[in-house]
């Protein structure tokens, strides 16, 4: 009682569960995402595997296929991971949108086939030039409710706007006047832990094959004494990729 083990959250202690143990009524959901790391994996950098597993399990849940076209809003570490993983899974039509030129240039190295600066141009016009009938998916990797409405004018009939993570507000007003007749909005605030655990093997396989370099997604390291500085840097948007606090 009073103890949890869903995530770290700077905890000093954690409860680790074994899903294969004979739990009365079955193992708790969190147990399926608690995976023992192989000895050759750096436990500091391996914190990035949490994002990797969440993203891969979300791609599977969303149902994105190699033949699909996807517009990704937000080229931070999460958006870059989506681009990289969809590229590894064979998706050829990947459009990256961001307001920062330096992040867009990064996106090209992670699988993006088209770059759009959403601050400098009309995103809908640019996307429709590339895909006159619209795209299959618009993915919000930035956590902005405005992207839901922006995406309505980008997707094809029966296309989907996909939202990953916790939105700024717990309500969204959807203006679907720019959309075709049929559309979907899917929110995935957190993947189920069993699905996250099932993604672990593929992530590690990509790492071992050299197709996925974990350090490509980390830009900053901080000691625990620098934790306040780290969070301030995050709030000031000065961490380009992932920042890790070491203990």
Where do the model's predicted regions map?
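Glycine-rich helix-loop-beta junction characteristic of Rossmann-like nucleotide cofactor-binding loops
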Residues: 60-65, 130-132, 153
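C-terminal capping/lid region of NAD(P)-dependent oxidoreductase domains
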Residues: 132, 162, 167-170, 213-217, ...
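Adenosine-nucleotide cofactor-binding segment
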Residues: 35-42, 72-75, 87-150
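Glycine-centered, small-residue-biased loops immediately flanking beta-strands
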Residues: 68, 159-160, 183
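Hydrophobic/small residue at the entry helix of a nucleotide-binding pocket
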Residues: 54, 78, 86
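Helix-to-beta-strand junctions that scaffold the AdoMet/dcAdoMet cofactor pocket
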Residues: 155-157
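NAD(P)H dinucleotide-binding glycine-rich loop of Rossmann-like/cofactor-binding domains
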Residues: 1-69, 73
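C-terminal substrate-binding/catalytic core of Rossmann-like NAD(P)-dependent dehydrogenases/reductases
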Residues: 125-128, 132, 170-220, 228-229
